[in-house]
Curated annotation (Swiss-Prot):
Record EC number: 4.3.2.1
Transmembrane segments: none
SUPFAM superfamilies reported in the protein's UniProt record: L-aspartase-like (SSF48557)
GO cellular component: cytosol
Gene3D superfamilies, sorted: Fumarase/aspartase (C-terminal domain), Fumarase/aspartase (Central domain), Fumarase/aspartase (N-terminal domain)
Name assigned to this protein: Argininosuccinate lyase
Protein family: Belongs to the lyase 1 family. Argininosuccinate lyase subfamily.
Annotated keywords: Amino-acid biosynthesis, Arginine biosynthesis, Cytoplasm, Lyase
Location of this chain's protein in the cell: Cytoplasm
GO BP of this protein: arginine biosynthetic process via ornithine; L-arginine biosynthetic process
InterPro entries attached to this UniProt entry: Arg_succ_lyase_C, Argininosuccinate_lyase, Fumarase/histidase_N, Fumarate_lyase_CS, Fumarate_lyase_fam, Fumarate_lyase_N, L-Aspartase-like
Top-level EC class as recorded in UniProt: lyase
Source species taxonomy: Bacteria, Pseudomonadati, Pseudomonadota, Gammaproteobacteria, Enterobacterales
């Protein structure tokens, strides 16, 4: 049953109906539409449209419908209803008769869908925050188990300075903390109810919209009806949150793909998150990580698409805004799936400590320590930087590590270098000296793990 039609003398072309209908995707708002309808029925009692007995009948029927939806949400798709609002109203009329036709009094699908979508977004934010925290917990536990796993840190994908696998894990804990805080900020701005704003000019019934907002679990009601039915900022914000979050997961995936490669060989991934080749029997491919990396693009695309949909729309509601849902649903589903998969990848990862240490000892990752040593001897840093660069060239010429050069070789670049330089160039010394907050020293990493555990567990 269409919720309109009196104005029309011809039925809609079936091709237009298929083009126009949205039930195939907005069926996901069924629970929110029913919850909003229950609250609206209560509001109609306060203005005399419904009496208490009528409201009870409607609420009971809606509660039964909610149970049916929760038991089998996909059954909705068998209907030819235009959208989820039409479907709910039709089902309600089936249960209570003409009384169901009174429920839409004073309400428009414009404020109805805006309310439904905000309720759905609130629930999704909670789900995403939980998944973010679970991944953070997995990272912290992996870090705690690998505090002694020394590995090279990279800039420009070249070995730069030694770090630990634990320190690498904690870097992503911080990124995810920002992701969670962005979700929380988004929630603060979307936590206002548009219900009662009608099509665009507000409802003609003196409904207490603040009370109505409270019944629905919103912090307050919106202030302007025209803005309320036009607003999709929360969709853009959530898509932005998802896009940034997926960038972080893509970087996480790329790091581990490299660490797992034969060239690095720092980690082994579990068989549970890898696959083989149909031709090459030896292959063990990091498919879970590659899919996380690959899915980043579709989320970015959803954000770009929604930006383009909204950029030229006049106030208030336009049918273009029906395009707000499919991209949002897919993007948040994708982000949630990738968060869960990233945690699964960490469950069973094996860090190959000897290989990590071997790599950290190569590539002259202790060169900065030699520069700092010279500074401590009174050499200006810029001059020390140049001296160490020359020493590295000599080490490369001899095919040796810096710490393997003879003292006489080092002293040809600076006479202040003495025997005390060799302990400074040791790998562990490179870590131990990074004692400032956020550094890679064992004490700082242990402190960061303890702080993260206190915050996340």
């Amino acid at each position: 049953m269409a919720l309109w039609g009196g104005r029309f003398s011809q039925a809609a072309d079936q091709r237009f109906k298929q083009f126009n209908d949205s039930l195939r995707f907005d069926y996901r708002l069924a629970e929110q539409d029913i919850i909003g309808s229950v609250a609206w029925s209560k509001a109609l009692v306060t203005v005399g449209v419904l009496n208490a007995d009528e409201q009870q009948q409607l609420e009971q029927a809606l509660s039964v419908l909610l149970e049916e939806v929760q038991a089998n949400p996909h059954a909705i798709l068998a209907s030819d209803a235009e959208d989820i609002h039409s479907w709910v109203e039709t089902k309600l009329i089936d249960k209570v008769g003409d009384l169901g036709k009174k429920l839409h009094t004073g309400r428009s699908r414009n404020d109805q869908v805006a309310t439904d979508l905000k309720l759905w977004c609130k629930f999704q934010i909670t789900e995403l925050q939980t998944a973010v925290q679970q991944l953070q917990q997995a990272l912290v536990m992996t870090a705690e188990a690998n505090q002694d796993a020394v590995m090279p840190g990279y800039t420009h994908l070249q070995r730069a300075q030694p770090v630990t696998f634990a320190h690498w894990c904690l870097a992503y804990v911080e990124m995810l903390s920002r992701d969670e805080s962005r979700l929380q900020d988004t929630l603060k701005r979307l936590d206002v109810s548009p219900l009662g704003c009608g099509a665009l000019a507000g409802t003609a019934y003196a409904i207490d919209r603040e009370q109505l907002a409270g019944w629905l679990g919103f912090a307050s009601a919106t202030r302007n009806s025209l803005d309320s039915v036009s607003d999709r900022d929360h969709v853009l914000e959530l898509l932005s949150d998802a896009s940034i979050g997926m960038v972080h997961l893509s970087r996480f995936a790329e790091d581990l793909i490299f660490f797992n490669s034969g060239e690095a060989a720092f980690v082994d991934l579990s068989d549970r998150v890898t696959s083989g080749s149909s031709l090459m029997p030896q292959k063990k491919n990091p498919d879970a990580l590659e899919l996380i990396r690959g899915k980043c693009g579709r989320v970015q695309g959803a954000l770009t698409g929604m930006m383009m949909t909204l950029k030229g729309l006049p106030l208030a509601y336009n049918k273009d805004m029906q395009e707000d849902k499919e991209g949002l649903f897919d993007a948040l589903d994708t982000w949630l799936d990738c968060l869960h998969m990233a945690a699964l990848v960490l469950d069973g990862i094996q860090v190959k400590r000897p290989r990590c240490k071997e790599a950290a000892e190569q590539g002259y990752a202790n060169a900065t320590e030699l520069a700092d040593y010279l500074v401590a001897k009174g050499v200006p840093f810029r001059e020390a930087h140049h001296i160490v660069g020359e020493a590295v060239v000599e080490a490369i010429r001899q095919g040796k590590a810096l710490e393997a050069l003879a003292l006489s070789d080092l002293q040809q670049f600076s006479s202040v270098i003495g025997d005390d330089v060799y302990p400074i160039l040791a790998l562990q010394s490179c870590l131990d000296k990074r004692v400032a907050k956020g550094g890679v020293s064992p004490q700082q990493v242990a402190s960061a793990i303890a702080e993260a555990k206190a915050r996340l567990f």
